[in-house]
């Protein structure tokens, strides 16, 4: 995954 990307918030 790209830095700073999160599938969970």
From Swiss-Prot:
GO molecular function annotation: toxin activity
The answer to keyword Secreted applying to this record is: yes
Asked whether the UniProt record includes Disulfide bond among its keywords, one would answer no
Principal localization?
secreted
A GO cellular component term found in this entry reads: extracellular region
Alphabetically sorted, this entry's keywords are: Amphibian defense peptide, Bradykinin receptor impairing toxin, G-protein coupled receptor impairing toxin, Secreted, Toxin
Task: Tell me the compartments it is located in.
Answer: Secreted
Query: Which biological processes are named by the entry's GO terms?
Result: defense response
Tissue distribution is: Expressed by the skin glands.
Q: Which N-terminal residues, if any, form the signal peptide?
A: none
Q: Which family does it belong to?
A: Belongs to the bradykinin-related peptide family.
Q: What is this protein called?
A: [Val1,Thr6]-bradykinin
């Amino acid at each position: 995954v790209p830095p700073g990307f999160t599938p969970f918030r």
